[in-house]
Amino acid sequence: VKRQSFILLFLVIVFLPGCKENGSGIGIGTVVVFPEISEPIQITDNDKEHLFASYYGINSFSKNQRYVTVLETELKDGIPTENNPATLGLVDLNTHDFIPLTKTRSWNFQQGCMAHWLATNPDSLIIYNDLRDGKFISVILNVHTRKEIKTIPYPVSGVSPNGKEAVSINFSRLRRTRDSYGYGGGGQDAKLETTFPEDDGMFLLDLETGEAKLLVSIADVKKLVPELPESGLEYFNHTLFSRDGSKIFWLARARPERNTTSLTVNRDGSNLQKCFPDGWGGSHYDWLNGDELMITAEYKGKQYGHILFTVGEKNYKRLGNGLLDFDGHGTFSPNGKWMVTDTYPKNDLREQKIYLMDMKTEAVLPLGRFPQPEEYAKKWRCDIHCRWSPKGDIIGFNSTHIGNRQCYIFKLGTLNDS
């Protein structure tokens, strides 16, 4: 697990000749200064299983970086159902104490309960999903008073940077099409009788009024995705607002083949478009800013990579000079200078690796190797799922390398130009 011989690895990577694809690359003799990075620091106890309470790339940190949102569960193996409530709490990064806040019955091992800190009060208010009275909802909670400020009659799948809007998808349909995602309990009508429903899809939520409007229906994407048999089901997952809140990215997928189409739309519902040509698909993603988007996909339908491009243009660029040609969970630092990504378990050692890339030169620094035990190889797997703190000086991630699921952080030193 410890980062061994990092200085040597750093120099080897930095002084390799660049491939110069699309004008990028690292020239011979280029010097890249990475921040000093701590050893992995475990922030949760081993008595129970823990994971960050949202999907990768979503901020889990309060604005002052004192607290992070974490789920605690006794479930180790198996798909969580409505009968497996998890405890949503905070970890105090000063003491590493776990502070329980509430229970939730809408969660999974991949995306947690989709807890977000709200920019309207980023040190006090979070929103998270739950199942109540047979319905999936979201709850706005003051973490210090434990007072519920508001309940929204829709679950959230992404929250706008301004903290005033969110998007919602059908988590019941998601559970029936990909059971390691979505929630148990039947809190929404999965509409299993319809391949492309016209009244379901991605909704835009007003978190102040609780009102929702259908932004893009599943039927709206029928002509943009591969043809399905009558028994097939198209579904939406993985939504993310751009950094300025003007656009939304998401994936349209299908059963039985799980073909994937990467899509974007403006926040007002205009300019619905595909991100890639046919055959590229899409898997993981993050916005660099309001217009540039990174998606891991099959470049030219041949090679998986971390592909950066401007929405609406075809200026596709594989990041990492060949070192990041895999499907990772890439996410950008708040200042856009760094991208951290990870790998799935590989070879007999089942090692998951974390890499940090300098966006200017595309130099890549390994941060660690984390072996995943065989018992986590199934649908309840533990992906690394990195996430940045608001100041960009902490990276949080999940790992099972000690034999159970726990939360960790790296602390990054500051650079003069950071």
Language-model regions, residue ranges each:
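Structural motif
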Residues: 78-88, 134-140, 176-178, 199-203, ...
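Short, conserved, GDST-rich strand-edge loop motifs in beta-rich repeat architectures
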Residues: 71-85, 131, 169-200, 251-257, ...
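Blade-loop segments of beta-propeller domains
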Residues: 55-57, 81-131
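Asp-box/WD-like beta-propeller blade repeats and closely related beta-sheet repeat scaffolds
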Residues: 106-201, 215-230
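Surface-exposed loop and turn segments in beta-propeller and other repeat-based domains
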Residues: 41-51, 102-109, 155, 210-232, ...
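Blade-terminus and WD-like Trp-Asp/Gly-His loop motifs, strongest in beta-propeller folds
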Residues: 58-68, 111-126, 130-131, 157-165, ...
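Conserved blade-ending motifs and adjacent loop-strand segments that build the rim/top face
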Residues: 279-281, 320-330, 363-385
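Loop/turn-rich, solvent-exposed surfaces of beta-rich toroidal or solenoidal domains
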Residues: 303, 321-363
